[in-house]
Amino acid sequence: MPRIGTTVKMIVAGVLLCIGGPALVQYVRPTEEELFQKFNPELQKRNLETRDQRQKDFDSFVTQLKTHAKSDKSIWHAIKESETTNRREVETRRKAELEEAERQKAQIRKELAEGS
C-alpha cells in the first residue's frame, strides 16, 4: 500500500485537475460580447441585420424537431415525411399560381380581342 503522503498528493492533484481545468477554461473563454467586438464593423452590421431572421429560423427548427420527436416514428422518417409533404404543397401552390397566370392571360387576350 502506498504511503499516506503519496495518496494525499494524488488526491490533491486529481481535485486540482477536475476543478481547476474547467475553471481555467471558463476564465480563458471569451464571452459572446467580446467575440462580437472583435468582428470588423461590416460583419457586426451584417450580424445585427440578420440576427432576427436567424433566431426565427432556429426557433422554427426547434419547434419542428419537437413535433417530430412526439411522433411514434423515427425522427428521420418523420422529417422525411414532412419534407415530402412540404414539396407537395409547394408543387400544388406553384401549379395554382401557373393556372392563375394562364387564366389572367386568357382573360387579357379575350378583353383585347373584344376591344378590337
From Swiss-Prot:
Residues 79-116 form a coiled coil. Its main location: mitochondrion. One of its GO terms (cellular component) is mitochondrial inner membrane. It comes from the Eukaryota. Residues 76-116 are annotated as: Disordered. InterPro entries: Cbp4. The keyword Transmembrane helix applies. The chain crosses the membrane at residues 11-27. Pfam families: CBP4 (PF07960). It is a single-pass membrane protein. It is found in: Mitochondrion inner membrane. One of its GO terms (biological process) is mitochondrial respiratory chain complex III assembly. Keywords: Chaperone, Coiled coil, Membrane, Mitochondrion, Mitochondrion inner membrane, Transmembrane, Transmembrane helix. The keyword Isomerase does not apply. Belongs to the CBP4 family. Essential for the assembly of ubiquinol-cytochrome c reductase. It has a direct effect on the correct occurrence of the Rieske protein, core 4, core 5 and apocytochrome b. This is Assembly factor CBP4. It comes from Ajellomyces capsulatus (strain NAm1 / WU24) (Darling's disease fungus). The lineage of its organism: Eukaryota, Fungi, Dikarya, Ascomycota, Pezizomycotina.
